[in-house]
């Protein structure tokens, strides 16, 4: 039975921004962190999924998962199309990655996070679980400074010119994959530096938005489409540019995309096409990385480090929390 909510939707979203959405990623991060270094990617991911779904269902929203753990026949929970929340309050789209960097968590390596985005209903890109070409830079540049179809070398030179520096002062973040060898060669041919990461391209894209602190000016490469939408939600909140294209290189992938509303398989998506309305983004560290500190387990306290953002205000909050009611994390 639906519960009447008297709070105006705009105020309700603000409340979610400050508290509820943070609790969702905190719970997922703590559950995954209990399995750091255990070498079991599936167990860590499942623990995060279970915790995130449980918390989502406590929120006063009518939520639909549009970016999740897979399509209905591939994932038992948080699948694309699943309804979450209390069936009360605003209708929202939900994008989740309960554990980005499953390998990082399993090996207790830096940079694993629990992350999600929430947007006005019908405004997030419904992307199939395929690969996506991506390029991203931070705020402060004219639109079109970099382009997805330009070469990596050209994009470095164009960004360097816009920034007023030599190409050797530019650093490009790239996932360390064999498929990116040409990108790496092209970037280095200009004198620019490449920073390689093993996993975690949501956090990788976010790094571009704050080059003064992260040392990263641009992200280039091919990664998961779901992660691309989550990263776009973050940039929608904090500023920046991003261009993406789904890689639909088989009939089966094109058909899956068509069923999800993709009419042009060659379309280049900007942030505004992937996130068309007000959105919230939150991420909590699982293992300590350059973006967030990992979960810390003390004798009587659990510490979490979270960033939460909202597009309509441009507000970014960092929340370092100490949790003393520990049983709230371990409800199996």
Stretch-by-stretch model annotation:
Residues 2-95, 157, 161, 188, ...:
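N-terminal subdomain of lithium-sensitive/metallo-dependent phosphomonoesterases centered on the IMPase/IPPase/PAP
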Residues 89-100, 104-125:
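DPxDG-like acidic metal-binding loop motif
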Residues 113-114, 134, 325-328:
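A short local loop/turn or secondary-structure capping micro-motif enriched for an aromatic residue
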Residues 16, 136-154, 169:
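Glycine-rich phosphate-binding "P-loop"
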Residues 84-85, 114-117, 215-219:
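Short basic, glycine-rich beta-strand/loop surfaces that mediate nucleic-acid
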Residues 150-310:
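An extended, acidic
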Residues 119-147:
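Flexible glycine-/small-residue-enriched beta->alpha junction loops
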């Amino acid at each position: 039975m639906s519960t009447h909510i008297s709070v105006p939707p705009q105020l309700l979203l603000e409340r979610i921004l400050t508290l509820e959405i943070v609790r969702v990623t905190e719970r997922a991060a703590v559950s995954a962190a209990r399995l750091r270094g255990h070498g079991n990617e599936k167990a860590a991911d499942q623990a995060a999924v279970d915790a995130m779904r449980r918390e989502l269902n406590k929120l006063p929203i009518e939520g639909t998962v549009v970016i999740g753990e897979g399509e209905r026949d591939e994932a038992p929970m948080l699948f694309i199309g699943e309804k979450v929340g209390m069936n009360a309050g605003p209708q929202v789209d939900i994008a989740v990655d309960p554990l980005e960097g499953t390998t990082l968590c399993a090996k207790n390596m830096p940079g694993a996070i629990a992350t999600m985005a929430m947007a006005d209903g019908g405004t997030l890109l419904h992307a199939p679980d395929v690969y996506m070409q991506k390029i991203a830079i931070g705020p402060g540049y004219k639109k079109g400074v970099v382009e997805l179809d330009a070469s990596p070398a050209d994009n470095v030179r164009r960004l360097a010119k816009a920034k007023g520096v030599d190409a050797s002062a530019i650093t490009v973040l790239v996932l360390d994959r064999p498929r990116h060898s040409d990108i790496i060669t092209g970037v280095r041919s200009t004198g620019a530096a490449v920073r390689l990461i093993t996993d975690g391209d949501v956090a990788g894209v976010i790094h571009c938005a704050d080059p003064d602190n992260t040392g990263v000016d641009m992200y280039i490469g091919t990664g998961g489409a779901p992660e691309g939408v989550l990263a776009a939600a973050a940039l929608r909140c904090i500023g920046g540019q991003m261009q993406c294209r789904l890689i639909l290189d088989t009939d089966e992938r094109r058909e899956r995309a068509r069923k999800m509303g993709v009419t042009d398989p060659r379309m280049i998506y900007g942030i505004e096409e992937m996130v068309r309305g007000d959105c919230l983004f939150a991420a909590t560290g699982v293992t300590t990385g350059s973006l967030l500190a990992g979960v810390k387990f003390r004798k009587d306290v659990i510490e979490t480090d979270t960033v939460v953002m909202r597009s309509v205000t441009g507000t970014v909050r960092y929340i370092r929390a100490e949790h003393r009611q520990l049983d709230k994390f371990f409800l199996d």
